[in-house]
UniProtKB/Swiss-Prot annotation:
Pathway named in the protein's UniProt entry: Cofactor biosynthesis; 7,8-dihydroneopterin triphosphate biosynthesis; 7,8-dihydroneopterin triphosphate from GTP: step 1/1
Gene this chain is encoded by: folE2
Protein name: GTP cyclohydrolase FolE2
Protein origin, superkingdom: Bacteria
Induction remarks: Repressed by zinc, via zur.
Catalytic activity: GTP + H2O = 7,8-dihydroneopterin 3'-triphosphate + formate + H(+)
Length: 304
């Protein structure tokens, strides 16, 4: 028969492993009596443009032009404000406090509601500017091309709003989506077949201050990325579907340079986009390296 040692009580175990009783200190425990270092005013030599909290995980509700029309996803927030040189620090707890208030009030994340949130953030912090950046996975239903077998895909979305007192909001939208690319050179020189691979398209689009946004910015950016690739990805494919996807890719060969330029053309035609950056990266199936292209364009500065 096994012999069992009788364990000491929980408090005794904790003390056994090093826990000690709290000491009675001399510093105040009431908030009103505590020294507030952040509010000490004097010259600290430099203004700070962005100070706040980053990597804040929080659930958000979003809407989508593609099914599911409404979904809750896990977002990552960066919330910052400016700090003049005569202030030592900010009250950072107010940033996450406001996020919790919006969450409790059933916040649906959109550029309109993010504008309101960012402006209120600046007012709560008593500063002249604030920036909120949000990243989250967006899920959408996709059917296979022939048998229409449905499954969920996702792309990573980026939203950013900057508020400056007495100035228009500065807004930016972004997406990182996966696509299929088939090599034109491989197709041209080979007797049969061509190497293809999965690629990543990342887009960042500056939103024109006077533009009316579409019903779903996410869908516009996804279309720009996928419709210019060799083929789209699918969560579920049966043999007839796989044949269709493979042949579609063969009919639409794309260098990484081609993909960047074609996406740029689509973004150029979107009235709500004032400037954009595009990154295309192919995980080459016949190389150990990636093929890479980056394209930047501003409608106000650059010419075609």
């Amino acid at each position: 028969m096994n012999q069992h040692t009788l364990l000491p009580k929980k408090t005794e175990r904790l003390q056994y492993f090093g826990s000690v009783s709290p000491i009675k200190g001399e510093k105040p425990v009431e908030k009103e009596k505590m020294k507030d270092l952040q509010n000490i005013r004097k010259d600290y030599f430099f203004d700070i443009q962005h100070v706040g909290v980053a990597n804040v995980s929080h659930p958000v509700t979003i809407t989508s032009a593609m099914m599911p029309a409404e979904q809750t996803t896990a977002a990552n927030f960066t919330m910052t404000c400016n700090l003049p040189r005569n202030q030592k620090g900010i009250n950072m707890s107010r940033l996450t406090e406001l996020l919790q208030v919006y969450h409790q009030n059933g916040w649906i994340l959109s550029f309109s509601s993010l504008q309101q949130f960012t402006k209120e953030l600046a007012e709560n912090m008593d500063t002249s500017s604030a920036t909120v950046e949000v990243r989250f996975p967006w899920f959408f239903e996709r059917k296979s091309p022939k048998l229409e077998k449905a499954g969920l895909m996702h792309a990573d979305i980026f939203m950013s709003v900057t508020y400056r007192k007495d100035q228009p909001f500065k807004q930016r939208a972004g997406i990182s989506a996966k696509v299929t690319t088939l090599c034109p050179c491989s197709k041209e020189i080979s007797e049969y077949s061509a190497h293809n691979q999965r690629g990543t398209v990342s887009i960042w689009a500056d939103i024109h201050p006077a533009a009316s946004l579409p019903s779903d910015v996410k869908a516009d950016l996804l279309h720009a990325a996928e419709s210019n690739a060799s083929a789209r990805l699918h969560p579920v494919l049966k043999r007839p579907d796989e044949k269709a996807v493979t042949e579609t890719a063969y009919e639409n060969p794309r260098f990484v340079e081609d993909l960047a330029r074609l996406i740029a053309a689509d973004l150029f035609e979107l009235e709500w986009v004032s400037a954009f950056e595009i990154e295309c990266r192919n995980e080459e199936s016949i190389h150990l390296h990636d093929a890479y292209a980056k394209l930047c364009f501003s409608k106000e500065v650059d010419k075609i």
